[in-house]
Design a protein with these regions (language model features):
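A conserved structural motif in NAD(P)-dependent oxidoreductases
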Residues: 101, 113-124
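A short, exposed helix-loop element centered on a Lys and neighboring polar residues
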Residues: 16-17, 61
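Catalytic Tyr-X3-Lys loop
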Residues: 1-14, 32, 49, 56
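Short, small/polar-rich loop/turn modules that mediate ligand/substrate recognition or access, typified
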Residues: 68, 73, 139-141
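Conserved catalytic-site loops of classical short-chain dehydrogenases/reductases
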Residues: 2, 29-34, 72-75
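Short, flexible catalytic-loop segment of classical short-chain dehydrogenase/reductase
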Residues: 40, 74, 79-89, 93-95
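Short C-terminal tail/terminal secondary-structure segment
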Residues: 41, 129, 140-155
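Catalytic loop of short-chain dehydrogenase/reductase
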Residues: 24, 30-56, 60-69, 81-82
Length: 155
């Protein structure tokens, strides 16, 4: 429990606290945290991840209101089903539980998605690059989903 809390919440919060003062002093900065779909839609049987990810997102939302007048924005970008090495690793574990190979589990998940494909790291990176730039100075306190339309609602 303690290690998980440290990894998911306390370490990111400490990093933000160490860097945001410099951003405020420069009257410009961007804090962009990586979230997950669980921020808005808890995943079954994943209580700790759901709780900690939502907690970090709410911390970011609160901080956003405190630092926006100093030229600092704070956002969370939450990917779902982006094809990475981690996605491949979890497919191997989940597939094995179902008697499937990693490739079969990946294909099953891909076909089940609304987009009919996994997101690419570039899909995620494009949003992060925009939020980090000068044209996103009024965009703060949000949880941005990169999910191929998989969200059950508008949030």
């Amino acid at each position: 429990l303690g290690t998980y809390a440290n990894t998911m919440v306390l370490s990111p919060v400490r990093m933000i606290q160490l860097t945001v003062a410099g951003m405020i002093a420069r009257t410009w900065g961007r804090v962009i945290m990586v979230g997950a779909a669980a921020v808005t839609e808890p995943a079954p049987n994943n209580v700790l991840s759901n709780m900690y990810r939502a907690g970090l997102a709410h911390y970011c939302k609160t901080l956003a209101g405190e630092v926006i007048r100093d030229g600092v924005t704070v956002n969370v970008v939450s990917p779902t089903a982006v094809l990475t090495e981690r996605t491949r690793g979890t497919a191997a574990v989940r597939g094995a539980r179902k008697g499937l190979t990693a490739e079969e589990e990946l294909a099953r998940r891909e076909q089940a998605s609304l987009a009919g494909r996994f997101g690419a790291p570039e899909d995620f990176g494009a949003l992060v690059a925009f939020l980090a730039g000068g044209n996103a100075g009024y965009m703060t306190g949000a949880n941005w989903r990169v999910d191929g339309g998989s969200a059950g609602g508008l949030g």
